[in-house]
C-alpha cells in the first residue's frame, strides 16, 4: 500500500530469492487480508483476518499444517489441523483476551456463508491466534467485538496495510513498535513460478538482540534508550501461504523454517513467548462433500524442498522487519 516505506525502501535487501508483485502474503492467488483497528485512549488493539480464498474455504478445504515453536499461547484450532491436515476456516488474529469473541464471530460468519450456499454445518474448526498487547492496550476491556471481525472480513484486500493496524495496533517487537508485516518469495519448480508468502503478528524479543541484515543494531539502541524489557514476554504468530503442491507433512516441514527468520532478527524464543506457525497450500482442494473413497493429492519432490525452506526463512525475516518499520508511534493507556 502506497505511503508507508518498507524495509527494502531503505536499501536493506533480505535474502536472494525474487519477490512477488506486492511482496506480501496476498501474492498467493486468492489470499486477502483485512483489518479492524481500535484506537482510543484506553484501547490500542484490533483484529486482522486472512482469507485463504475468494471461495468457501469450508466447502473446499486446503491442505494445512501448524507448528508450535514455544507454546506460551492460546491459539484456537490447531488440534484439528494437526490431526486432519486441512484448513476449513479463515484465520483471525487478535489480542489474548479477545480470542473467544473473535472465535464466535468466525463461527457466525461461516454459518451464514454456508447457509447461503445450502451447506449445513454441524462441526467447524475456526482458527484464531493471539498475542498479548496489554503493554499498550487495556486488554481487560476486551474491546474487540463481533461486528469488528465482520468489518475486517468485509474490508479484506490484496494490498493491505502493515504496522500498527488491526491486531497489530498494540503490539511491541524488540521493545520497539511491532504489529503486522508481510513478505513473499518466488520459487521456480519444473519451469513454473510458485509463490510463498508470510504474514506475521510480531510481539516478541529484546531490544539488545535486534539484528538487521546480520548486524546487531539493538545493543547500541538499548544503551541509548531506557524503558526496555529484561524478560521476553511476547509472542509471534506466523501465517505461511503457498500455491506449491505440498502434503500436510511437507507443509509442516516448510513452516518450521520460519524459526530461521525469527533467529536472524534476534529472537531467542523466551519462556513467555508464544511462537506459533500456521501454514496452508492452495494447490490441493479437499472437498467437504467429497463422494470418492480415494482422492489424489499432488506433492512436491522431497529432494527439492530446500528452496521452499529458504523462501519461508527469507519471508519471515523480512515480514518481521516490515512489521516494525511500517509501524507508527503508539502511546499506551498507562
Language-model regions: role of each:
Residues 1-334:
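Alpha/propeptide regions of enzymes that mature by internal proteolysis
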